[in-house]
């Protein structure tokens, strides 16, 4: 019976009977006004001329991660899907971050999702002036390994890439399996 249930479920997934994957969305195609970016920079420089403090988030999930997807379901009082474009807009316009990293769970990232994430990261970085970006978005994923003891439990690790060029990033994220 387990095989029959699994076969029916797998067929349903293949035929898209359980819904469709949300698209990555399109971030608002504008950077912060340059006067705001300049004011922020000058405020930091007036405090300490030798160092610059940057604020960022290195652990951001969208609804491409299974846990974030489940918590976003309206049946659980969630708001619905939050694609990567929402994360970009939140980082830029709400959280006023200097940088952030997209770190959806590797084991949930299909080739289609990974391709969408890479395109969305590039779109998120586009509105800003290349020489003076208002926000830097890094491509990444979360590698998770769960063991049954402290000796073989490695937990969650965020993998980040400095480049977003297609020929400089992996073809797929590598999960722990």
Predicted regions: what they are:
Residues 2-177:
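Extended, charged catalytic domains and RNA/DNA-binding interfaces, predominantly
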């Amino acid at each position: 019976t387990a095989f029959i249930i699994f076969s029916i479920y797998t067929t349903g997934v293949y035929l898209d009977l359980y819904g469709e994957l949300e698209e990555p969305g399109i971030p608002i195609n504008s950077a912060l006004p340059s006067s705001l970016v300049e004011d922020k920079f000058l405020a930091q420089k007036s405090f300490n001329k030798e160092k610059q403090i940057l604020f960022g988030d290195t652990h951001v999930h969208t609804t491409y991660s299974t846990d974030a997807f489940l918590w976003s379901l309206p049946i659980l009082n969630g708001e619905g899907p939050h694609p990567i474009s929402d994360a970009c807009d939140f980082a830029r316009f709400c959280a006023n971050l200097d940088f952030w990293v997209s770190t959806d769970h590797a084991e949930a990232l299909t080739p289609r999702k990974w391709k969408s994430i890479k395109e969305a990261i590039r779109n998120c970085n586009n509105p800003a002036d290349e020489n003076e970006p208002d926000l830097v978005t890094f491509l990444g994923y979360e590698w998770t390994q769960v063991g049954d003891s402290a000796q073989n439990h490695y937990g969650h690790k965020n993998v980040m890439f400095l480049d977003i060029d297609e020929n400089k990033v992996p073809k797929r994220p590598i999960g722990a399996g």
